């Protein structure tokens, strides 16, 4: 259900570091730099988890990103995360009652037809 952010443990995920190149009739795989090599370029005090394209910086305290701040690492992506909870059944019922369409039955008194002798019609 959903996408897995990181492969680990007993999961068997294809490597994201391999890229196929065709040379003649042979297919050869070339490797991109491994995470250990990329981790050496990070500032001290930072840890990474996950694949290179999904790595997340873990640092003590909270981190905020100002809108004008450009990342030095173009592979680093930020995301807004919202935690939502399911409403309880009572809340759902209450909301449904608030938004429900109201119906009314209108009863008009039955008109008694009268005969108009001048025109010869019912009025």
UniProtKB/Swiss-Prot annotation:
<feature type="region of interest" description="Disordered">
    <location>
        <begin position="17"/>
        <end position="74"/>
    </location>
</feature>
<dbReference type="Pfam" id="PF15147">
    <property type="entry name" value="DUF4578"/>
</dbReference>
<dbReference type="GO" id="GO:0070062">
    <property type="term" value="C:extracellular exosome"/>
</dbReference>
<feature type="compositionally biased region" description="Low complexity">
    <location>
        <begin position="32"/>
        <end position="43"/>
    </location>
</feature>
<feature type="modified residue" description="Phosphothreonine">
    <location>
        <position position="30"/>
    </location>
</feature>
<keyword id="KW-0597">Phosphoprotein</keyword>
<feature type="compositionally biased region" description="Basic and acidic residues">
    <location>
        <begin position="44"/>
        <end position="54"/>
    </location>
</feature>
<dbReference type="InterPro" id="IPR028106">
    <property type="entry name" value="DUF4578"/>
</dbReference>
<feature type="modified residue" description="Phosphoserine">
    <location>
        <position position="62"/>
    </location>
</feature>
<protein>
    <recommendedName>
        <fullName>Uncharacterized protein C11orf52</fullName>
    </recommendedName>
</protein>
């Amino acid at each position: 259900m959903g996408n897995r952010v990181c492969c680990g443990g007993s999961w068997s995920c294809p490597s994201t570091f391999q890229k196929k190149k065709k040379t003649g009739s042979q297919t050869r795989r070339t490797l991109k730099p491994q995470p250990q090599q990329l981790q050496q370029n990070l500032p001290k005090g930072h840890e990474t988890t996950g694949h290179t394209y999904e790595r997340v910086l873990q640092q003590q305290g909270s981190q905020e990103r100002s809108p004008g701040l450009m990342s030095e690492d173009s592979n680093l992506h930020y995301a807004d995360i919202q935690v939502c909870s399911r409403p309880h059944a009572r809340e759902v019922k209450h909301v449904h009652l608030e938004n429900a369409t109201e119906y009314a039955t209108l009863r008009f008194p039955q008109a008694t037809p009268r005969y108009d002798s001048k025109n010869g019609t019912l009025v």
